[in-house]
């Protein structure tokens, strides 16, 4: 089996392998000039032979990624309605994401 890791960012967990492309919530310090993304909250690492489980994180394990683009998610629509009161409210929201390509798993 090929190596993989489980990283946590934006209060969500992602299982990643080298070469994967994932969409994560916006991170501080990332811009068009600074394209390197480091995920330091690595919860689990499998290197092909043995597994390391963190408590809560695996020490000195880092997942390196590269920013591909800024993307926006699908539109989510919330609709409020109260019967017999002539009240309707339509609210839309689109979340901003970073599209990141995983370059390396450092253990």
Curated annotation (Swiss-Prot):
Record has Cell division as a keyword: no
Any GO CC annotation of this UniProt entry: ribosome
Highest taxon of the lineage: Bacteria
Keywords, ordered alphabetically: Ribonucleoprotein, Ribosomal protein, RNA-binding, rRNA-binding
One Pfam family hit: Ribosomal_L21p
InterPro entries with a match to the protein in the record: bL21-like, bL21-like_sf, Ribosomal_bL21, Ribosomal_bL21_CS
Any one GO molecular function term: structural constituent of ribosome
Keyword RNA-binding annotated: yes
Gene Ontology biological process terms from the UniProt entry: translation
The protein's assembly and partners: Part of the 50S ribosomal subunit. Contacts protein L20.
Function, as annotated: This protein binds to 23S rRNA in the presence of protein L20.
HAMAP family found in the cross-reference section: Ribosomal_bL21 (MF_01363)
Family the UniProt entry places it in: Belongs to the bacterial ribosomal protein bL21 family.
Protein name: Large ribosomal subunit protein bL21
Originating organism: Chlamydia muridarum (strain MoPn / Nigg)
């Amino acid at each position: 089996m090929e190596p993989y890791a489980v990283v946590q960012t934006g209060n969500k967990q992602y299982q990643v392998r080298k070469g994967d492309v994932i969409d994560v919530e916006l991170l501080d310090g990332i811009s068009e000039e600074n394209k390197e993304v480091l995920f330091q909250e690595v919860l689990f690492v499998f290197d092909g032979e043995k597994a390391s489980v963190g408590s809560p994180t695996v020490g000195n394990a880092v997942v390196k990624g590269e920013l591909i683009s800024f993307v926006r998610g699908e539109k989510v629509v919330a609709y409020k309605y109260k019967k017999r009161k002539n009240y309707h409210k339509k609210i839309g929201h689109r979340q901003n994401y970073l599209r990141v390509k995983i370059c390396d798993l450092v253990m």
